[in-house]
Amino acid sequence: MNLNKNLPTGTRDKLFREAQAAYKIEQQVNHYFEKRGFKRIETPVIEFEDVFSSEHQADAKLYRFFDEKGRLTVLRPDMTLPIGRVVSTTGVTLPLKLSYSGKIFRANEDFGGEQNEQTQAGIELVGYPSIKAEIECILSGIGVLNALEIPNFQIELGHAAIYRRVIHLLNLPETAEIDFRLLIQNKSLTGIQQFVANNPSTLDDFILALPRLFGPAKAILKQAKNLTTDKGILTALSEMETIVEAVSYTADISVDLGLVQDFHYYTGIIFRGYADLAADNFLSGGRYDHLLEQFTSFSSPAVGLALNLDSLTTLQNRAGIIKKQAPTILLIHYDLDALPQAEKLMQETPNSELSFFDTSTNAISFAQKWHIPTVVHVSNQGIQTIFQKEADL
């Protein structure tokens, strides 16, 4: 079967206006991070599988292949772990404020509608234990969305320690923990009621309420504090309150106390970004204070933010924000010995381009086909207009 005209599942081409919009968004995001003092970092698209083994060892979403020495390598499925590898192996001095953008690859199931190749940009604050690091990530995310003019977006907060604390106190075996995780993620009221009946604990009231503990931040956090006396959960709720108070002036902030991230390295505040025109979140991140332990003997506090730039491009398109490229208004046909004059004219004339045809007849035909209103001929004798489209009445 010849596949030379096909694309792998979950990949797609971007043409013209969409490709230009995606390029500009990546530029805007990187420029915004640079203005906030972040230093850019780049890592290879190809990594050894061991970099992701702790997070993805039972995950079939990796693109795996062997290198020339028979070692198992992968296309990176996220950017955070490679940056953790860099920080832990290069001896760079902490703390650090890092930014990045690039491609990630995840082998999602066929027909799921997910893109296996995504463009991601983000930031990592490594070595900052203060809650100000979470606040900086959230403010940076909000700032990017405002700069991109994304309409009606909302930031949702959760806390990884809440779910971790519940699991710790329940002391569930691994299979039961997986089932419970799915119940929480799916907000299954009847399933959680049955679970509590089979696994009674001092957290019964809190667990039963978890599927409903999402919505306006201040009201939900106040309600949650009345449902438990556990110090670990109350500490997590207090951290969320602190962040809500700090950033609520910038955007609509909601909470979801049943928010469980797919990546298990999160240890504290987690957050996502949604918008009315988007089917899924396009912004995610949180605190992961033990990430470096996978690569070295020491740990370091860290907080990260990731943005799906492909989703943001789609959002801009749906919102009518993406502008058409300015049309070419002048085609410059030239003789080879007059190239310097033609180049100078193009540099001085906005929305102009050079003709690559040998004859003026072909240049004029091209202009008519692509609705370019004016064609000039540049020679050593000067500049002559050889085609002028009649003005529309």
Curated annotation (Swiss-Prot):
GO terms for molecular function: catalytic activity, acting on a protein; histidine-tRNA ligase activity; transferase activity. Keywords: Amino-acid biosynthesis, Cytoplasm, Histidine biosynthesis. One of its GO terms (biological process) is L-histidine biosynthetic process. Gene3D superfamilies: Bira Bifunctional Protein, Domain 2. InterPro entries: aa-tRNA-synth_II/BPL/LPL (IPR045864), HisRS-like_core (IPR041715), HisRS/HisZ (IPR004516), HisZ (IPR004517). GO terms for cellular component: cytoplasm. It comes from the Bacteria. This function is generally fulfilled by the C-terminal part of HisG, which is missing in some bacteria such as this one. Required for the first step of histidine biosynthesis. May allow the feedback regulation of ATP phosphoribosyltransferase activity by histidine. This is ATP phosphoribosyltransferase regulatory subunit. It comes from Listeria welshimeri serovar 6b (strain ATCC 35897 / DSM 20650 / CCUG 15529 / CIP 8149 / NCTC 11857 / SLCC 5334 / V8).
